[in-house]
């Protein structure tokens, strides 16, 4: 087999592939035998008709096409290996010449993984946030714990106010007609939680147990149900019960009740450490994002359209999954946004291109710096996954048997970003 390679623009390669006549004849013979076992020739049992009759019945061209269906993919894989390229999409194949006892010549144009021209990626300046914890931040965490572990006291005689948990019956109407899904009995609602549409909770404030009131609201313009967006509605609300939080005093007893610590001072110190760790994590994430962004900006790479299109589909798939959690379909979202699917895909292209470039640059840096994933690191990661899902490690290994490359890549990616941060200049 002969293979010649021509490099085209935008990370595309054209392979001219010539398969010897002998190989074509072998493939033709194999295809003929397969067809001969199935074709029905009057006066002969299947597979027993003379060759000339079979070829006349189905046509040599048909047999040759069957042969090419097997010969083309086989020879293409060999040609790719011989040319030393890494395709990222299916090839565009065009036949040049072929015959039963002739060489097969065809061209295959395909997008390949592009070469990355790295720029500066070490010594990059990144901003390191100062990690300071104020007394106010600790007090805010204590206040959260007070509310979380507060006792609920029934208010027999008094008005509802923000922070109270109320039990209500409500029934909504729009244009005098019952609102689908707009009614409930014995519904628990914390006033100020903003669970309901704007204006609803505010109008419950001041109501007393046993009181019934009509509440007028307008659905937001961006409400997820398009038929309700921007429209007014009336809810008949009956307040059945008010429960008010009784906060425990901040003392050593409180610390014992809500934590493993014996004193309030110990609890405060622990909260301070946790806040500091959270800030450290946020600072680290921002440094990582900044150093990766700069390394990517400094690199040059011609990204083929197919890689961008694949990433658009990947982003779109995840977006559809997110919409499901919001009980929306992609079609409903597009109708609400007044967009077509093609318009949405076009909007996603810059993000997709950036994603692809980022991964290519990180991969190139890892290759240049010799960053790899060791067997020990892979085993350690599998152990973490097994612990997370409370499954035996061997079971996790079976599940990841076909995805070990992905797992190794995630480790290499993590190590590469760590390398960039460690070799950056924090300012």
Swiss-Prot record:
Q: Does the keyword Phosphoprotein apply?
A: no
- Where would I find the PPIase FKBP-type domain in this sequence? 163-248
User: At the top level of its lineage, which domain of life is listed?
Assistant: Bacteria
- Pfam families annotated for this entry? FKBP_C (PF00254), Trigger_C (PF05698), Trigger_N (PF05697)
Keywords, A to Z, come to: Cell cycle, Cell division, Chaperone, Cytoplasm, Isomerase, Rotamase
Gene3D superfamilies, sorted = 3.10.50.40, Trigger factor ribosome-binding domain (3.30.70.1050), Trigger factor, C-terminal domain (1.10.3120.10)
The primary site where this protein sits is cytoplasm
Q: Where in the cell is it found?
A: Cytoplasm
Chain ranges passing through the membrane: none
PROSITE patterns for the chain: FKBP_PPIASE
What GO CC annotations are associated with the protein?
A: cytoplasm
Q: Which GO terms describe its biological process?
A: 'de novo' cotranslational protein folding; cell division; chaperone-mediated protein folding; protein transport; protein unfolding
Looking up InterPro entries in the UniProt record yields:
PPIase_dom_sf (IPR046357), PPIase_FKBP_dom (IPR001179), Trig_fac (IPR005215), Trigger_fac_C (IPR008880), Trigger_fac_C_sf (IPR037041), Trigger_fac_ribosome-bd_bac (IPR008881), Trigger_fac_ribosome-bd_sf (IPR036611), Trigger_fact/SurA_dom_sf (IPR027304)
* UniProt-recorded Gene Ontology molecular function terms: peptidyl-prolyl cis-trans isomerase activity; protein folding chaperone; ribosome binding
Q: Which reaction does it catalyse?
A: [protein]-peptidylproline (omega=180) = [protein]-peptidylproline (omega=0)
Q: What is its EC number?
A: 5.2.1.8
The free-text function statement in the UniProt record for this protein reads:
Involved in protein export. Acts as a chaperone by maintaining the newly synthesized protein in an open conformation. Functions as a peptidyl-prolyl cis-trans isomerase.
Query: What family classification does the UniProt entry report for this protein?
Result: Belongs to the FKBP-type PPIase family. Tig subfamily.
Which comment does the entry carry about domains?
Consists of 3 domains; the N-terminus binds the ribosome, the middle domain has PPIase activity, while the C-terminus has intrinsic chaperone activity on its own.
- Family annotation (NCBIfam families): tig (TIGR00115)
Q: What is this protein called?
A: Trigger factor
Q: Which organism is it from?
A: Carboxydothermus hydrogenoformans (strain ATCC BAA-161 / DSM 6008 / Z-2901)
């Amino acid at each position: 087999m002969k293979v010649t390679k021509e490099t085209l623009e935008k990370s595309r390669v054209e392979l001219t592939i010539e398969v010897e006549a002998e190989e074509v004849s072998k493939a033709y013979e194999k295809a003929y035998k397969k067809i001969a076992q199935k074709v029905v020739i009057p006066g002969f049992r299947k597979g027993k008709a003379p060759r000339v009759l079979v070829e006349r019945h189905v046509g040599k061209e048909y047999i040759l096409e069957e042969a090419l269906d097997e010969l083309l993919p086989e020879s293409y894989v060999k040609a790719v290996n011989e040319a030393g390229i890494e395709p990222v999409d299916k090839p565009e194949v065009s036949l040049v010449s072929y015959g039963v006892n002739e060489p097969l010549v065809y061209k295959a144009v395909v997008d390949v993984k592009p070469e990355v021209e790295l720029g500066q990626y070490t010594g990059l300046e990144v901003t390191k946030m100062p990690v300071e914890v104020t007394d106010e931040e600790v007090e805010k965490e204590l206040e959260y714990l007070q509310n979380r572990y507060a006792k609920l006291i029934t208010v027999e005689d008094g008005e509802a106010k923000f922070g109270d948990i109320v039990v209500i019956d409500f029934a909504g109407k729009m244009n005098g007609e019952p609102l689908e899904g707009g009614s409930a009995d014995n519904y628990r609602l914390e006033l100020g939680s903003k669970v309901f549409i704007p204006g609803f909770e505010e109008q419950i404030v001041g109501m007393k147990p046993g009181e019934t009131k009509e509440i007028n609201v307008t659905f937001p313009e961006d409400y997820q149900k398009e038929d309700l967006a921007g429209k007014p509605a009336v809810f008949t609300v009956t307040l059945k019960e008010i429960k008010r939080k009784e906060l425990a005093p901040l003392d050593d007893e409180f610390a014992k009740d809500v934590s493993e610590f014996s004193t309030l001072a110990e609890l405060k110190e622990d909260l301070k450490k946790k806040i500091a760790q959270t800030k450290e994590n946020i600072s680290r994430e921002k440094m990582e994002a900044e150093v990766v962004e700069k390394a990517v900006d400094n690199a040059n790479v011609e990204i083929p359209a197919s890689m961008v299109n694949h990433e658009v589909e990947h982003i779109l798939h995840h977006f559809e999954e997110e919409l499901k959690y919001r009980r929306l379909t992609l079609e409903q979202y597009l109708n609400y946004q007044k967009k077509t699917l093609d318009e949405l895909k076009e909007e996603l292209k810059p993000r997709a291109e950036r994603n692809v470039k980022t991964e290519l640059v990180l991969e190139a840096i890892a290759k240049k710096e010799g960053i790899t994933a060791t067997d020990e690191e892979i085993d350690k990661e599998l152990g973490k996954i097994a612990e997370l899902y409370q499954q035996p490690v061997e079971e996790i290994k079976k599940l990841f048997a076909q995805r070990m490359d992905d797992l190794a890549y995630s480790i290499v990616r993590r190590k590469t970003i760590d390398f960039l941060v460690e070799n950056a200049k924090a300012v």
